[in-house]
């Protein structure tokens, strides 16, 4: 993942919060139980938290309210600008992405919501290998994202979106890199993590991986 999605992020920045509130019918199911998904990620995190894809700051705010020390990473200038307006004065968001970032301190938990699918499976593998080097034993990765049980589940979801006339959603599912649970499980395990997957809506699962 380089900067190829930054234009999309900048365009989406000013309408993102309306998306997560379910105002776009095509993405209503993707963002179903959005607040509960964020809370679940917060509850599974601890200590110093590195957040990738801060976006407009929704998860960041909940992490801060829960007493976490948060280091935010966000590639989009527009997203960073909106997030800074919503977050406490003085909170710093650093430009970067899942693979290119600076770590200012010891990290206990790495979190992200609705973003890891911007990486190819090969890039996901490289990222998790990198995080494995950052985390001590007991450290965690907690990612919430659209992921599929298997190829059949993915194919059925794309077909259903097309049948419902949700062509933007179908195109999104076919353009980005939404992976399968067995692939992610293999990536986590080979990099020294024990991982569990919890489904929170039709699309989104929370991946909780603990460094062994």
Swiss-Prot record:
GO biological process per UniProt: methylation
Any Pfam family: Methyltransf_25
Residues given in the record as S-adenosyl-L-methionine binding sites: 53, 74, 97
Taxonomy, superkingdom: Bacteria
Keyword Protein biosynthesis attributed: no
Enzyme class: transferase
GO molecular-function terms, A-Z: S-adenosylmethionine-dependent methyltransferase activity
Keywords linked to the UniProt accession: Methyltransferase, S-adenosyl-L-methionine, Transferase
EC number(s) on file: 2.1.1.-
The UniProt record lists the keyword Glycoprotein: no
Family: Belongs to the methyltransferase superfamily. YrrT family.
Free-text function comment from the UniProt entry: Could be a S-adenosyl-L-methionine-dependent methyltransferase.
Name the UniProt record assigns to this protein: Uncharacterized methyltransferase Bcer98_3087
UniProt source species: Bacillus cytotoxicus (strain DSM 22905 / CIP 110041 / 391-98 / NVH 391-98)
């Amino acid at each position: 993942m380089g900067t190829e999605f930054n234009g999309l992020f900048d365009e989406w920045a000013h309408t993102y919060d309306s998306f997560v509130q379910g105002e776009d019918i095509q993405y209503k199911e993707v963002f179903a139980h959005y607040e509960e998904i964020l809370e679940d990620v917060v509850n599974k995190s601890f200590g110093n938290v590195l957040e990738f894809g801060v976006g407009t700051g929704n998860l960041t705010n909940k992490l801060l309210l829960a007493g976490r020390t948060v280091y935010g990473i966000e590639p989009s200038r527009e997203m960073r600008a909106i997030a800074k307006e919503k977050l406490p004065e003085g909170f710093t968001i650093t430009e970067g992405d899942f693979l290119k970032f600076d770590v200012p301190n010891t990290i206990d938990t790495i979190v992200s919501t609705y973003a890891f699918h911007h990486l190819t499976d090969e890039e996901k593998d490289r990222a998790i290998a990198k995080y494995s080097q950052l985390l001590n034993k007991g450290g965690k990765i907690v990612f919430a994202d659209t992921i599929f049980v298997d190829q059949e589940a993915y194919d059925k979801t794309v077909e259903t979106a097309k049948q419902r006339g949700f062509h933007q959603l179908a195109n999104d599912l076919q353009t980005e890199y939404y992976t399968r649970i067995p692939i992610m499980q293999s990536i986590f395990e080979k990099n020294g993590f024990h991982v569990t997957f919890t489904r929170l809506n039709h699309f989104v699962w929370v991946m909780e991986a603990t460094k062994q």
